[in-house]
Amino acid sequence: MQLMEYTQLALFLGLLALMSPVLGRFIGRAVLRGEQTWMHSVLGPVERLIYRASGIRPEARQSWRQYAASLCAFSAAGFLMTFGVLMLQDKLPLNPQGFPGLSWHLAFNTAVSFLTNTNWQSYAGESTVSHFSQMVGLAYHNFVSAAAGLAVAVAVMRGLASQESKTIGNFWADLVRSVLYVLLPISLVLAVVLVGQGVVQTMSAGTEVATLEGGRQFIAMGPTASQVAIKMLGTNGGGFFNANAAHPLENPTALSNLLQMLAIFIIPSSLVFTLGGAVSNRRHAWTVWFVMACLFMVGACSLYRAETLGTPLLTEVAQAPVTNMEGKEVRFGIFGSAMFATVTTDASCGAVNAMHDSLTPLGGLVTLVNMQMGEVIFGGVGSGLYGMVLFILLTVFLAGLMVGRTPDYLGKRIEGREVTLAMLALIIAATPPLLFSAVAAVSGWGQAALNNAGAHGFSEILYAYTSGVQNNGSAFAGLNANSPAWNVTIALAMLIGRFGIMLPMLGVAGSMASRKARPIGEFSFPVSGFTFGLLLTLVIVIVGALTYLPALALGPVVEHFQMLDGLLH
């Protein structure tokens, strides 16, 4: 890496470290505790109007089971609405292109995808989905799916901070506050800034232009900036255009690229400090944040190194070192593309400014491992925080076993119930990618979708199901996944990955809330400092990533050795 690359990395992490504690404190006041903020003079009446119109009593507290039931009911209603909009879009307004309704399996996959904050897209947005579907069906879920994740994270924090309580908050109040005070204001500001950078925002279908070759070309357009802002901020990732953030009308400049990367990480990063404030332990928050930052830097530097080395076959033909610029935009270069790929797979975002299918085998391996570690390297909005809490509980439990102490976290004993729920969440998350990948690899419908045979074809299958279950949404685009079998199985993976972790973590929150915290003494395992950070990192890598090692050995690892032998370029 050169000085310019080091400077860009330091600038990105520096801005993130400066902004995150500030936003984290604000989220703690506005969402976690429901206190008055400077926004309440404007948005407070709107919040109260929503409560009155929908019959919500924000002061009513819910047990973890009631909280989970509200979450599931809200998600089911959102799915039905979006499924109907997509199926009937030819009969709905704001469809200047005259797009027909989606097939049942594509509508099912897409509705589940946006409901679960995955935004996996088996279609090209600008040629398949109307403006109405984009704004009402999809952009709506960009807000509420992120808000649901944020609400669950806040509920988990309450569970850790409360003592001898049977409740963990009110899902409906947490949802409304997350949208009104966090997602909506930041998205509005970011959308305006992106328009200033050249991202389009129009209700027209597009325009026809004369090309340099003398021909005519239709340029698709639409309400892009408003959707890009929330798709990044909410770690959704689904692009208005098929090329996603590589499209010049969606991500035109280096500054827009930096802003979009910051938008992806800012809320997950801030929630770490919200947790620190909730449990009155800011050193713990900084330790967890540095673990996330270190894992991010290792991934970004590894991916950058893999792409700058290129491939031996092309180097031999060129008689000079050739970097891997395939699938990348010149305006971003290798470092800007490697950074974005690392950010988007560390968070459960899935937006791309370069084609991940064109990465070198080791570059693709980095993106896969980022997701397979559980999307806890900052992670998605809310999901990154409660996923990290899962690994923290396991770390403290294992540390207690090693030294013969009763494991406790923040003064509360960790018992069999919490460990069982945590391991259940890990097993639920690991099973669908391995099981569905095995089935697809030997099935006719699975093999028919591949444009690449051998190790890379298997990597495409493994990436698709890993992306689905980790609610990421990015893809190795050589896979033709728009078929009934693919759409249904990936949708099932997305549902399992979303609720198979959310619900056990709500159970953990309810269990921890009922406990009384003991004073933290000299025999308590410290949850800050180098030792804890190192143990947490090892648990994330060993328990998270090594689960998939045999599958990775059959995909990107084999492909890397084939590349070194000159069998691949």
UniProtKB/Swiss-Prot annotation:
Topology with respect to the bilayer: Multi-pass membrane protein
A GO molecular function held by the record: potassium ion binding
Membrane-spanning segments: 3-23, 68-88, 136-156, 179-199, 259-279, 284-304, 384-404, 422-442, 490-510, 534-554
A GO term from the CC aspect: plasma membrane
Highest taxon of the lineage: Bacteria
Cell location: Cell inner membrane
InterPro entries reported in the protein's UniProt record: KdpA
Self-association state and partner proteins as the record states: The system is composed of three essential subunits: KdpA, KdpB and KdpC.
NCBIfam families reported in the protein's UniProt record: kdpA (TIGR00680)
Family as reported in the entry's similarity comment: Belongs to the KdpA family.
Function statement: Part of the high-affinity ATP-driven potassium transport (or Kdp) system, which catalyzes the hydrolysis of ATP coupled with the electrogenic transport of potassium into the cytoplasm. This subunit binds the periplasmic potassium ions and delivers the ions to the membrane domain of KdpB through an intramembrane tunnel.
Protein known as: Potassium-transporting ATPase potassium-binding subunit
Species lineage: Bacteria, Pseudomonadati, Thermodesulfobacteriota, Desulfovibrionia, Desulfovibrionales
